[in-house]
Amino acid sequence: MRVKTARKRSTSSVRWLQRQLNDPYVAAAKREGYRSRAAYKLIEMNEKYGFLKGARRVVDLGAAPGGWTQVVAELCPGARIVGIDLLEVAPIPGADIITMDFMAPEAEERLIAMLDGQADVVLSDMAATTTGHRQTDHLRTMALVETALDFAIKVLAPDGSFVAKVLRGGTENEILTVMKRHFRTVRHVKPPASRPDSTEMYVIAQGFKG
């Protein structure tokens, strides 16, 4: 579908709109009731690696707008699902989501109290607000991943899993090295729903050693 350029609409916004209109995952999300196309990234990764199977406690870091949380609620009925995001997330049945900056000092304590036990899975689709400078964006997002990993190491039950978004840029191998010390299996994957022109990838760490 082609999009006509409005006089005051930027070329980049036209490209974004055209991409959205032509994206089968956007159409599928609208049709199936998911809040974002990102839901399919989690679905695809879980279908291949099964990290949500049997999960009873799951944490979703960077939950807005709620696509990943929706998937977890569907695949893990009855599980304790807690999420956090700086942006407010509309209620999702079966999940408790707090509006708070995950990087805030009190966030970790709040999440641990809400979990009321060790987590089976910690998910992080967090990414820093983009600046337009690729290396800066990479470093800022990797700082979020490092904090998410530190949290996961504290709350995961033995044999638990950690799944996080990373941006390619040179330093992601360092965090993979750290993960390999704590998990039996660590993979670097790009699900089909991740746009080919995006630098994002996901790390899937399974078999937490405790």
Task: Identify the function of each model-found stretch.
Residues 1-56:
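Class I SAM-dependent methyltransferase Rossmann-like catalytic core
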Residues 168-210:
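Class I S-adenosyl-L-methionine
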Residues 54-64:
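Conserved class I S-adenosyl-L-methionine
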Residues 86-131:
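S-adenosyl-L-methionine
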Residues 65-77:
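Conserved SAM-binding loop of SAM-dependent methyltransferases across substrates and taxa
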Residues 77-79, 156-161:
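Short glycine-dipeptide loop
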Residues 142-158:
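A short glycine-rich, Lys/Arg-flanked "PGG" loop and its adjoining helix->strand segment in the class I
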Residues 47-53, 115-116, 154-155:
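Glycine-rich helix-loop-beta junction characteristic of Rossmann-like nucleotide cofactor-binding loops
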